[in-house]
Amino acid sequence: MESKFWEDVEVGEQLPVLEFPITVKTLILGVCGTRDLMPYHHDPEYSKSIGNRDMFVNTMFEQALFGRFVTDWCGPESDFRETGLQMLNQLCPGDIAKIEGTVTEKLEDGGEPRVKLQLTASNHIGVAATSTATIAVPSRSDGAVRPLTSIDRPKMDPHPEIPDFAKAWLGVESAKGAGGYPVSEVQVMYWCDMVEDMNPLYADTPYARESRHEGMIAPPMGLITWTMQRAGHTGVDAAAPDVNFPERAPWPPKEAQKEGGGFPMPPGMTDTIAQGSVQAYGVPVRPGDRVSSTNETLNCSPQKETKLGPGYFQTNLQTFYNQKDEIVGTNLFTLLRYGGSGGA
């Protein structure tokens, strides 16, 4: 796997197209690679029963596939600094995911050479997802990319007409909630298996040990995977996580929730659709790390009339920490909260 230098990248450059078949095995590997046991990603009957075309790959799979696509092009000497993702459609078994990308900008940020990319994933129906990526790239004049040792949490000015109920949410960061499992070499390998990612930094290789990271790291866009709960706790209904046998209680038995916390729901709203997210990456995650996260609401629009009825666009922040209390990444994402009668 060769690595690009910043000087050799051209704005407008097209990345080599990647075609990736989506099969039943792809979905199984997706469950293994992301630890996401939500039934619409592995149970076709259930997924169709709630109006989907079939079972479909999750957002973490899309992030992994875009990540593999970028590093296939730039090589392992570049580091991801930020990615964005917007899901537009679903990739299901039988589809061929076509991944395309373009260099949109070359810049220096704080003296660090960077490249910005615009990416798309499409199938026979149309565009399934779009993504952006900002990568730090080695330079012949400035040398190798330097791993980050810290990262700031993003800030946002609230909407000038933010509803009164949402003002009380601002500045309130939840307690930390830890993932169900520590990061492991095996889990990273499953992640690579699901999208056929050959990045040598994601394995205990001589290259990784001799690299700027001084050892194996985890794919940076796996932030949400590292905080997924135990498999026996994951489901549409957390109290009855197996949709095929609702009588089965969570296993191992769950104690009262003492840590973490979700995001508040605007009054009168009942449903949620993710609109998009932007992740930024800090201290690299490594096997053996125990990742936890906090939640905070940064913004909320006034009530809007949408295709789904009245709703609010709510911007939330997840901050991810390792066991040393270092920030390993942030996830800034917007949700459409809808389904109520309005008038709140």
At which residue positions do the language-model features occur?
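Hot-dog-fold acyl-thioester-processing enzymes
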Residues: 1-79, 140-276, 342-344
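Mid-chain, well-packed structural core segment of small domains
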Residues: 73-84, 88-93
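HotDog/MaoC-like acyl-thioester-processing domains
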Residues: 1-16, 91-177, 273-344
